[in-house]
UniProtKB/Swiss-Prot annotation:
GO terms for molecular function: protein homodimerization activity. This is Corneodesmosin. It is found in: Secreted. Residues 61-99, 128-207, 224-248, 431-466 have a biased composition (Low complexity). The keyword Secreted applies. It comes from the Eukaryota. GO terms for cellular component: cornified envelope; desmosome; extracellular region. It comes from Mus musculus (Mouse). Residues 1-32 form the signal peptide. Keywords: Secreted, Signal.
Length: 561
């Protein structure tokens, strides 16, 4: 009996031991898997992403990300970890066509907008998201209203990462591209990646040619009013025309007619560094300054009388003027000259709260009130790229963001209100291969605002075609006497991007002319005040209360000292 029970007990004990061993082997795997799922950094919405992030490339070697840009964007894998995005087939036409941008956790979302009446290509075929592949041949012409892309768009198989040939000439008005042609077999490499084709045609026909340079990460090409963009690192410009943030109640001040322009462009200079990865950021900057001795509270200048151009951001350490970050979004692009770390943005050589910029001797401090947090002020110029292009067909566009307040982008036009558009607050390098009326000569009067002197290049005819392919817009003053010079027209009025990439309406608070002598004596309002109410750029980079002067409730007009 005993001998007959022993094997049975042993057998039972053996089974129990085996069960324990199996549980010991299986449970840790299950727990590890569940813990790994819970703590998967790829699912962290606050994760800082980069183009070569394994979360984007994929861990299994199959299709890693499916580009869902709005309509018929898709992912076509020709090999392991092939990120095939015929990016931004969400290029529906009109005033809110979206182009793809990075969005933490999901790879990208829509945030840029194309303006004008059709024919915009913020994505589509020729969106080359691998370092391999020169796209040659005709990539399918678009005509008619449907704008479906057909034909052979050329297989991408080289290593140059350039696009040659006519990259999708558009002659229709709808121009949505399904991006269904063309095979991609390259790996995602950030050094020569092209997410969204930097050609944008809004209005007139004409082919656009894209020649991205090496290192031009995430190019987009939303431009305005029938302008064909040619340049691998072109920017997208969203504006609120007629929004009027002012630094003081001075009629016809440099800020009395300027729009708010934010930057969602891709250009990252060769000297640009990012802490923790390339997490894109859009920033709204407000300028503060005294205008020089005896002009406190007036529009700032370069140390002379009021009404002159304010200093660029490069001169923030000089006696007059300074810039402050007043809003922004972590759902859009990082601009040149900036770094991102710990949820904050920093300029190259940023200030800390131990050494902040506090205005200048004899000039008022910044209007933000108490001591600032790190990353709130800029010491270098995040607007003008530090690297240019020697190619005659591709110049980087250097608009990073609009220094609002006194100075910056100003209204200009041909004399009619409808044709007014902003001049540039800093130098802009723009290439146009075929455009309609993207540039307008300025009349130069105080009612029209200032205009810009041309740099290299010229404007010919009514089509505003650029003979040399390059125009550099200089800083605008408050009352320019030089007429006939180009200004960039921005006819649309949505602000750039909400959390879901949808355009935000312009708040009615800023649409009227402001100043003590304006009709109805409408007070000028600070963009900081508008941002705290409307939040047009998504999540703010800092507490809105910090950006308001002490003791002043939200919603009240701001007077800047």
């Amino acid at each position: 009996m005993g001998s007959s029970r022993a094997p049975r007990m042993g057998s039972v004990g053996g089974h129990g031991l085996m069960a324990l061993l199996m549980a010991g082997l299986i449970l840790p795997g299950i727990l590890a898997k569940s813990i790994g799922t819970l703590s998967d950094p790829c699912k962290d919405p606050t994760r800082i992403t980069s183009p070569n992030d394994p979360c984007l490339i994929g861990k299994t070697g199959s299709n890693s990300i499916s580009s869902q840009g709005g309509s018929s964007s898709f992912s076509s894998q020709g090999g392991s970890s092939s990120f095939s995005s015929h990016g931004g087939s969400s290029s529906s036409q009109g005033s809110s066509s979206g182009s793809l941008i990075y969005k933490p956790g999901t790879g990208y979302s829509q945030s840029s907008y194309s303006y004008g009446s059709g024919g915009s290509r913020p994505g589509g075929s020729g969106s080359q998201s691998g370092s391999s592949g020169s796209q040659s041949g005709s990539s399918g012409s678009q005509s008619g209203s449907s704008g479906s892309q057909s034909g052979s768009s050329g297989s991408q198989s080289g290593s140059s990462g350039s696009q040659s040939g006519s990259s999708g000439s558009q002659s229709g008005s709808s121009g949505s591209q399904s991006g269904s042609s063309g095979s991609q077999s390259g790996r995602w490499v950030s050094s020569s990646s092209q997410w969204v084709s930097s050609s944008s045609q809004s209005g007139s026909s004409g082919s656009s040619r894209d020649r991205p340079g090496s290192g031009s990460a995430l190019p987009t090409g939303d431009k305005t009013s029938g302008m064909s963009q040619s340049g691998g690192s072109s920017t997208s410009q969203s504006s609120s025309s007629n929004l009027r943030p002012c630094s003081s109640n001075v009629p016809d001040s440099p800020c009395s007619g300027g729009p708010v322009i934010t930057h969602s462009g891709p250009y990252i200079s060769g000297t640009h560094t990012v802490s923790g990865g390339q997490r894109p950021v859009v920033v709204v900057v407000e300028q503060h300054g005294s205008g020089g001795p005896g002009f406190q509270g007036m529009p700032c200048s370069n140390g002379g009388p009021a009404g002159k151009p304010c200093p660029p951001i490069t001169s923030v350490q000089k006696p007059y003027g300074g810039y402050e970050v007043v809003g922004g979004s972590a759902n859009s692009y990082l601009v040149p000259g900036m770094t991102y770390s710990g949820g904050k943005i920093y300029p190259v050589g940023y200030f800390t709260k131990d050494n902040p910029i506090r205005g200048s001797p004899g000039a008022p401090s910044f209007a933000a009130g108490p001591p600032v947090s790190e990353g709130k002020y800029f010491s270098s110029n995040p607007i003008i790229p530090s690297r240019g292009s020697s190619s005659s067909s591709g110049y980087p566009v250097g608009v990073a963001f609009q220094p609002v307040g006194s100075g910056g982008v100003q209204p200009c036009g041909t004399g009619s209100v409808s044709s007014k558009g902003p001049c540039s607050g800093t130098r802009i390098q723009i290439t146009s291969s075929s455009s309609s009326t993207s540039y307008h000569p300025c009349s130069g009067g105080p009612s029209q605002g200032p205009c810009s002197s041309p740099g290299t290049g010229s404007i010919s005819g009514g089509s505003s075609s650029l003979s040399s392919g390059k125009i550099v817009l200089q800083p605008c003053g408050s009352k320019s006497t030089s007429s006939g010079y180009p200004c960039l027209s921005v006819p649309s009025s949505p602000l750039n991007g909400g959390l879901n990439g949808s355009p935000q309406p312009v708040p009615s608070v800023g649409v009227k002319l402001c100043g003590l002598n304006s009709p109805g004596r409408v007070p000028c309002r600070s963009i900081r005040n508008i941002l705290t109410q409307v939040k047009p750029l998504g999540p703010q980079l800092m507490d809105p209360k910090v950006s308001l002067p002490q003791g002043e409730p939200q919603g009240e007009p701001l007077e800047k000292s």
